[in-house]
């Protein structure tokens, strides 16, 4: 799908910046009242010191950000796609609604156009580079008229990330093989070797065990193939909702005799989950790729990292 929008800096006159013949919406970069439809948008605005601009969200109970929770009585929860409370959305008088479109254009588009409410897609979900995802905070700094703050906030992240990546690469430690995920129905979805999670595993000194998928999306494999992969893996990561080995045993009983399960080398990215089940990994990790990398290095090569894991925990 194609989205047409033009973002102009708040210090410039709009008519001087819009390309001739441009017919899309024009966003002036000085948003003060923002409705964020994804928790990653909240994390990005928080990273650049602009979380107070958020006046509306989607699914407030599942959001981990402490500022949003502290202000929850004054923040509108507009609901989810397919069941948006447009009356509430209008009452929030937003300068901008931030959208995402993982499966195509948002169903909110046409209604927002009808209501003359400015909107913009934040494309972090299209990025496979961990640093590329985080850099979208700079785009949101432009939206809020704080470009310099955004660039400064982002600049330190690749420095820390690449320093740790180099430390791992310069070491003479082994390369543990890593299995990912749990079944969904009768299939087991395995990410591409070029995916966000596979890149993090490689940069942390691990070896993603499924090298067949070199495309641009996860692909399903059958449970038999998944069992063979898990049997060869040194470690098993990102195991759904499991909080313990017993949880994993209940959902994947046939996998309890795999080496990684028997050795207790099973780790999940749900160490920061709130009472409603909202997982901060899917919120703030997008702006903290260096911390996610550090967690994985701690798991693969604990002698290289002193800090304890933030997003990951070992299942007991």
What kind of feature is each model-predicted range?
Residues 33-36, 53-58, 96-100, 119-122, ...:
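Structural recognition of the beta-strand scaffold that forms the well-ordered cores
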Residues 1-13:
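Short, small-residue-biased leader/transition segments that mark boundaries at the very start
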Residues 8-9, 50, 115-116, 204-205, ...:
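Short, structured coil segments at secondary-structure junctions
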């Amino acid at each position: 799908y194609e989205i047409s929008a033009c973002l102009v800096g708040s210090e410039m006159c709009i008519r001087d910046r819009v390309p001739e013949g441009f017919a899309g919406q024009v966003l002036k970069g000085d948003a003060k009242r923002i409705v964020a439809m994804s928790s990653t948008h909240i994390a990005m605005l928080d990273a650049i010191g602009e979380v107070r601009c958020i006046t509306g969200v989607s699914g407030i109970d599942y959001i981990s950000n402490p500022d949003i929770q502290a202000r929850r009585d004054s923040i509108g929860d507009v609901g989810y796609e397919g069941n948006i409370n447009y009356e509430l959305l209008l009452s929030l008088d937003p300068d901008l609604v931030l959208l995402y479109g993982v499966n195509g254009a948002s169903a909110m588009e046409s209604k927002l156009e009808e209501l003359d409410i400015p909107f913009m897609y934040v494309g972090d979900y299209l990025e496979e580079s961990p640093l590329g995802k985080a850099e979208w905070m700079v785009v949101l700094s432009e939206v809020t008229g704080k470009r310099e703050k955004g660039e400064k906030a982002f600049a330190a992240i690749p420095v820390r990330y690449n320093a740790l990546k180099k430390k791992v690469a310069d070491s003479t430690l082994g390369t543990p093989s890593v299995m990912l995920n749990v079944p969904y129905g009768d299939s087991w979805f395995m990410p591409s070797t070029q995916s966000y999670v596979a890149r993090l595993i490689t940069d942390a000194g691990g070896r993603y065990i499924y090298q067949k998928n070199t495309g641009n999306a996860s692909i399903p494999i059958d449970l038999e193939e998944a069992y063979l992969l898990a049997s060869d893996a040194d470690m098993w990561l990102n195991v759904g909702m499991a909080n313990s080995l017993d949880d994993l045993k209940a959902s994947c009983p046939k996998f309890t005799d795999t080496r990684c399960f028997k050795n207790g080398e099973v780790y999940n990215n749900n160490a920061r989950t709130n009472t409603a089940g909202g997982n901060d990994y899917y919120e703030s990790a997008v702006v903290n790729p260096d911390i996610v990398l550090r967690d994985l290095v701690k798991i693969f090569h604990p002698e290289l990292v002193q800090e304890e894991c933030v997003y990951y925990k070992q299942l007991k």
